[in-house]
């Protein structure tokens, strides 16, 4: 069983709070998303803009990793009582993909490349994710997916380590 965005209904999505909670529940892994920052680092983040889930604004690609790590990723999260219990929490921060791999060495990770293939970020993200996976020896526990078929094709060009690859929507429909 995988926690979607780390378990976004229970904790601020794609934060250490969410991933820790999924581990505590005994889940097998996480479904997560990655985007490339201005300084070409991968972060664990779904949206192209930081506005919906943080106290910041603008595109992920217009901020450095250091700038993004200063944002409060628990800022807009509300619980079932419409409270904001994780606002300002030290584990409600944006994680880099490398941090995710380091913090959870025994968890499976289904990672979705979000950056569109026709953007600068999209052109280099497949190589960056491949390099991160190899650097952390995580090739046996990561599945790389994307709604963009071109991203899977690009990742495949680098993939000499037999890292699992998910089918695109078009491939599933065929």
Residues covered by each model-derived region:
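Phosphate-group recognition and catalysis centered on beta-loop-alpha active-site segments
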Residues: 1-174
